[in-house]
Each structure stands twice: as structure tokens, then as C-alpha cells.
Amino acid sequence: MYFARTLSKNDLHKEAAEVFEKAVNMDTARVELLKEMGSEYEAVKDYDKAIGAYKRYIDQAKDVKLNDYFNLGKVYYTAGASIRPTEDGVVMTESDSMRMVDYLKGADSLFAHVVEKAPESYLGYLFRGRANWAIDNPQAPKLAKPFYEQAIAVMEKDPQKNAAGLIEAYRFMGVHYIGLEDYPASLEYWKKILELNPDNAEAKRMAEVLPQYIQQ
């Protein structure tokens, strides 16, 4: 597989993926190559082929790790999140919307498996929040909220280590409460962001603006 890996190092990812695929098809016992094949297809944003490769690995390998499920979930999530209108103001087609939802539901299912097997980790909760928020649905914030709350509960045990994830989750909560016009609740989350990163421009702006709405 030296040739395939050399192609990959030279950013010829599609060509590398095809070499890996031929090798696996010629010798189906070489299951470990499926992950490399999936990674190469992922690099060229051929998400369907990447998903297919990772799923084959999970189905066939004897030493599947929880991280393999997590990584497959991330590919599903990236595939779903990549489906957007091509121009501002253009409504997404029904078929694209259905494809996006299917990918994101696939991601959510895999992240739910991660939560089940590793409830002490914040990653499953955080990515379930991301997947549900990305769904093009008015109920998306409501669907995502419990997962972000669970992620926060885990991450707040070590705020400095988990600062990036906490800022993301606090931002979601802040935006969510603005949508509900619960400005005091929203303000608390922007303040939490500033405790972790006093230079966060968005949080500074919201901390200045929201008190005006609270006083009205």
C-alpha cells in the first residue's frame, strides 16, 4: 500500500482511495485498509463512499473501537451539514432537505451509541447537539437543547480543559434563549463565555446589548 499512501501524501486522495478500494476488493481479508480508503474519500468530500467504507470496516473488523463509531458519525454529520442552498435567499430543494435530514439522523444515531457506551464523555452529547441543531427544522433548537445541556454538565467538571466545547454549548444556549425572548437567561450564558474567554467579540457584544432589552 506504499503507492496509495504516497498518492495521499501528494494530495491525490481520490486516486489513493481507488487504489485502496482495488486492494480491498482483491483481498477482502485486508479489512484495515477500509479505514484508509474511507479517509481518502472523505478528503475529497465523497461522503457516500467514505460512509460506505467506514461502515464496511465496522461490519467486518474484529477489533472495532468506539472511536470508529464516533468517526463514522462525524462523516455523516459533515455530509449533512454540507448540504446548503447554493445562494443566499435560495430555498433548499425538498430532495436536498431530505438528504440532509437522513445524514444528520444517521449521525445522531451513531453519537447516541457513543453516549450509551461512554456516558462520562462529553463528545457524544456535544455532537448530538450539533447534529440536531443542524437539521433544517423549526424544532431544531428544541431538539438540540437537552444534548447541549448534558454536554455542559460533563464539561463543567473541568472548564479550562473543555473551554472550546463549553463556549460552543454556551453560545447555543445563549442563541436559543434569544429566540425565546428570554433575555436574562440568554445573558447568563454570554457571561459564562466571557469567564472563559474575555476577548470573545460576540459574547462582549451580546453582554452589552441584552441588558437594554431586559430593562424595557
Features from the language model and the residues they span:
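Alpha-solenoid helical repeat scaffolds
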Residues: 1-180, 202-215
